[in-house]
């Protein structure tokens, strides 16, 4: 009888030790798992932080690159007296017109919706005048409306312009002969591509460009024609 009681007592004690050891192992496993979870969580947070900083840096670099390109490129702070040679812009006031507005219009979002009465083509907006002005007055008119006289980049754009012109007379574009550079220059400061366009007429001081039937002609800048604004 005593042996039986001793056996039962030993059996109970053995079970208690086994249960305690199991509890200790389970708690230890949980502690290890929690430790690794904290490590992984820390690594994840660090990686996310690095990615966020990298993205912010890229955005800042792109923004600075666009700004520097705009500042150092054709959109300089030179006055329009330099770009238009000896032309007097807006006679009487002899106002100096900065090219900052041209720079702003070129860096604008290409997906912007065109204003009322403006036509959209290839991410740009076009306005066709019904009045007639000299080249310099036409230039000022466009600039005051946060745009510039038409700059034509290729024959497809020329075809679009001709399709929407409802008359066959001359129309001013943003191209003139500058005495300082002694060349035909667009209002954004870039030279004309002679491989794409040929200008009929003299290349001399006080000469501005007008289009008629898909051709570009040299005309006296004081002549009065209709014009096209673009942004």
UniProtKB/Swiss-Prot annotation:
<dbReference type="Pfam" id="PF00059">
    <property type="entry name" value="Lectin_C"/>
</dbReference>
<keyword id="KW-0812">Transmembrane</keyword>
<dbReference type="GO" id="GO:0051132">
    <property type="term" value="P:NK T cell activation"/>
</dbReference>
<dbReference type="InterPro" id="IPR001304">
    <property type="entry name" value="C-type_lectin-like"/>
</dbReference>
<feature type="topological domain" description="Extracellular">
    <location>
        <begin position="60"/>
        <end position="231"/>
    </location>
</feature>
<feature type="glycosylation site" description="N-linked (GlcNAc...) asparagine">
    <location>
        <position position="96"/>
    </location>
</feature>
<dbReference type="InterPro" id="IPR033992">
    <property type="entry name" value="NKR-like_CTLD"/>
</dbReference>
<keyword id="KW-0430">Lectin</keyword>
<keyword id="KW-0597">Phosphoprotein</keyword>
<feature type="disulfide bond">
    <location>
        <begin position="142"/>
        <end position="229"/>
    </location>
</feature>
<feature type="glycosylation site" description="N-linked (GlcNAc...) asparagine">
    <location>
        <position position="176"/>
    </location>
</feature>
<protein>
    <recommendedName>
        <fullName>Killer cell lectin-like receptor subfamily F member 1</fullName>
    </recommendedName>
</protein>
<feature type="glycosylation site" description="N-linked (GlcNAc...) asparagine">
    <location>
        <position position="77"/>
    </location>
</feature>
<feature type="topological domain" description="Cytoplasmic">
    <location>
        <begin position="1"/>
        <end position="38"/>
    </location>
</feature>
<feature type="modified residue" description="Phosphotyrosine">
    <location>
        <position position="7"/>
    </location>
</feature>
<dbReference type="InterPro" id="IPR051379">
    <property type="entry name" value="C-type_Lectin_Receptor_IMM"/>
</dbReference>
<dbReference type="GO" id="GO:0030246">
    <property type="term" value="F:carbohydrate binding"/>
</dbReference>
<keyword id="KW-0472">Membrane</keyword>
<feature type="domain" description="C-type lectin">
    <location>
        <begin position="121"/>
        <end position="230"/>
    </location>
</feature>
<dbReference type="GO" id="GO:0007166">
    <property type="term" value="P:cell surface receptor signaling pathway"/>
</dbReference>
<dbReference type="GO" id="GO:0032393">
    <property type="term" value="F:MHC class I receptor activity"/>
</dbReference>
<dbReference type="InterPro" id="IPR016187">
    <property type="entry name" value="CTDL_fold"/>
</dbReference>
<keyword id="KW-0399">Innate immunity</keyword>
<keyword id="KW-0391">Immunity</keyword>
<dbReference type="GO" id="GO:0005886">
    <property type="term" value="C:plasma membrane"/>
</dbReference>
<feature type="disulfide bond">
    <location>
        <begin position="208"/>
        <end position="221"/>
    </location>
</feature>
<dbReference type="GO" id="GO:0045087">
    <property type="term" value="P:innate immune response"/>
</dbReference>
<comment type="function">
    <text>Functions as an activating receptor involved in immunosurveillance upon binding to various ligands displayed at the surface of myeloid cells. Upon interaction with CLEC2B ligand, stimulates NK-cell cytotoxicity and cytokine production leading to the cytolysis of malignant CLEC2B-expressing myeloid cells. Actviation of the common cytotoxicity pathway involves SRC and SYK kinases.</text>
</comment>
<keyword id="KW-0675">Receptor</keyword>
<keyword id="KW-0325">Glycoprotein</keyword>
<dbReference type="GO" id="GO:0016020">
    <property type="term" value="C:membrane"/>
</dbReference>
<dbReference type="InterPro" id="IPR016186">
    <property type="entry name" value="C-type_lectin-like/link_sf"/>
</dbReference>
<keyword id="KW-1133">Transmembrane helix</keyword>
<keyword id="KW-0735">Signal-anchor</keyword>
<feature type="glycosylation site" description="N-linked (GlcNAc...) asparagine">
    <location>
        <position position="91"/>
    </location>
</feature>
<feature type="transmembrane region" description="Helical; Signal-anchor for type II membrane protein">
    <location>
        <begin position="39"/>
        <end position="59"/>
    </location>
</feature>
<comment type="subunit">
    <text>Homodimer. Interacts with CLEC2B.</text>
</comment>
<dbReference type="GO" id="GO:0004888">
    <property type="term" value="F:transmembrane signaling receptor activity"/>
</dbReference>
<keyword id="KW-1015">Disulfide bond</keyword>
């Amino acid at each position: 009888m005593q042996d039986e009681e001793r056996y039962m007592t030993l059996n109970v004690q053995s079970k208690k030790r086994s249960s305690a050891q199991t509890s200790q192992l389970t708690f230890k496993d949980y502690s290890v798992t929690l430790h690794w979870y904290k490590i992984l969580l820390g690594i994840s947070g660090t990686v996310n932080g690095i990615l966020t900083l990298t993205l912010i840096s890229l955005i800042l670099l792109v923004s600075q690159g666009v700004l520097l390109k705009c500042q150092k490129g054709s959109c300089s702070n030179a006055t329009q007296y330099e770009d238009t040679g000896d032309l007097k812009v807006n006679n009487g006031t002899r106002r100096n017109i900065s090219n900052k507005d041209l720079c702003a219009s070129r860096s604008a979002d290409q997906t912007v919706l065109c204003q009322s009465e403006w036509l959209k083509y290839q991410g740009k907006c076009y306005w066709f005048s019904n009045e007639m002005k000299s080249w310099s007055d036409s230039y000022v008119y466009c600039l005051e409306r946060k745009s510039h006289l038409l700059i034509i980049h290729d024959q497809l754009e020329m075809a679009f312009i001709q399709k929407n012109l409802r008359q066959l007379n001359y129309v001013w574009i943003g191209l003139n002969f500058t005495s300082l550079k002694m060349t035909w220059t667009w209002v954004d400061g870039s030279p004309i591509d002679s491989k794409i366009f040929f200008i009929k007429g003299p290349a001399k001081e006080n000469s501005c460009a007008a289009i008629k039937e898909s051709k570009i002609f040299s005309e006296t800048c004081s002549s009065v024609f209709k014009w096209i604004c673009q942004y």
